[in-house]
Amino acid sequence: MEISSFTQTVDAEFAPKSTYLNTATCGLLPRRTVEGGVKALVDENAAGAVPGGGSFEVVDRARARFAGLVGVGPDRVAIGSSVAVHVGLIAASLAQGAEVLVPEGEFSSAVGPFAARGDLRMRYVPLDGMAEAVRPTTSLVALSSVQSADGRLADLDAVRAAAAAHGARVLLDATQSAGWLPLDAGAYDYTVTGGFKFLLCPRGTSFLTVTEEAQETLRPLYAGMMAAEDRWGSVYGPVERLAGTARRFDAAPAFLAYHGAEHSLALLAEIGIDAVHAHNTALAARFRTGLAGIGHEPVPGRTAIVAVPGLGSREPALARAGITVSDRAGNLRAAFHLYNTQADVDHALEVLAD
């Protein structure tokens, strides 16, 4: 997308009233999502209009939109309400004693369901040593593409190669990258993604992708009508026939969130992930350069999330200046997305320089 078209499209959808650099916590909702999705369903519900409570067709359109963004078919996508729901499904399907390899400091939703079982062998290693740590006894490697605490990018090619060499499966949490970093979800056995950050969806949207081969390893824990081949024919009694696709792993959707998600995902498809990636990483690079110029050393990398170790205590002062960032693990964390500008970067640098 041309720069002028990019700017016009973004300006038509967003009007932040502060310097919002906190998409790694929660993304802003586009105007079309609020008005054409969420508010429209709320109004229908209030009036008792059909479909009122929500539409399976809308959920399936959101599924297809997400699939298009991550390079798989809709038949490889299951929906839910949180990353932990999907990770819990995978954790429940592992054999007793299976070895799970995760990075130290990984976000809790990606590791907690495995650790909570109590009968799995958990191994924690530094992020930059993940590939070397895979061994023949490893059953699953679980990691985020971009770390929540500091924005570091994992060496995903090396991890996949090591896992393949030792017969281990890979679970990728793309919550902090989907929406700005190009992703080929089909290259992983499983991916999980929360929709409320860089995908700009309302909270309550999440997506699981699973390859056709890896699908056979999972148990359909949420086998209600959403997981049935014939939804409306499976309202009562046990589901006689599960969907043959990844939809068999669907959890009950928060319809209000998915009615909005359809529009948010359509916006990202219109703009293009490559264009968003170029925009976001350029702003992040400007911020890193500016930080170095005022005596701060950010975590290096070409990522849309910038973290400065030991500077998290400045978050309240930035908030008073109208700048929204996060304090994560002692890091000052700023995240850049399509609605941010160079003026946002410069405003944050000006306050930090005082």
Language-model regions: role of each:
Residues 1-354:
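Pyridoxal 5′-phosphate
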